Swiss-Prot record:
The protein's name in its UniProt record: Ribosome maturation factor RimM
Free-text comment about domains: The PRC barrel domain binds ribosomal protein uS19.
Any one Gene Ontology BP term: rRNA processing
InterPro entries given in the database record: PRC_barrel-like_sf (IPR011033), PRC_RimM (IPR056792), RimM (IPR011961), RimM_N (IPR002676), RimM_N_sf (IPR036976), Transl_B-barrel_sf (IPR009000)
Provenance organism: Prochlorococcus marinus (strain MIT 9211)
Keyword annotations of the record: Chaperone, Cytoplasm, Ribosome biogenesis, rRNA processing
Subunit field text: Binds ribosomal protein uS19.
Amino acid sequence: MSRKDSWLTIGKLVGAQGLRGEVKVNPSSDFPERFINPGERWLQKNTEEPSRIELKSGRQLPGKSIYIVSFIGITDRNKAESIVGNKLLVPSDQKPKLKEGEFHLVDLLGLKAKFTQDGSDVGEVIDLTSAGNDLLVIKLVEGKTVLIPFVKEIVPVINLKQGWLLIKPPPGLLEL
């Protein structure tokens, strides 16, 4: 499985934790079991082919969105530091089933962003990030990149089949 769309990024390894090989993960998944339940995961460094790794255990830091995980074979801080920066992946066929109106954030990548007022093109969703809540990274038509909070009030309509979402940004948000 090597095609880009065959994988689902569930987080990024952002730092070593302690001396016993634990690693901090910034999640891009709303499913905690992906960071807690043992089993097969995959690591990807930059654009290299993903490599298999076995998650041994994990826990969420109290009051934070960061998880601390341990992998089989990563037993000290040096080994943990050697995998920092990698993306944590699962095969895309492991996407959980969603209820009506729910979305996998990764499915929003590449969608056209349009204004709710007149349907005119604003730009394209090029990335997702988290800063307390989910943010869409949108490259505007004129080339500038902006962060849009992914909340119903600002992103009221999403049409995955037609490849667009509507945004209703508060005044000044696109000028930041």
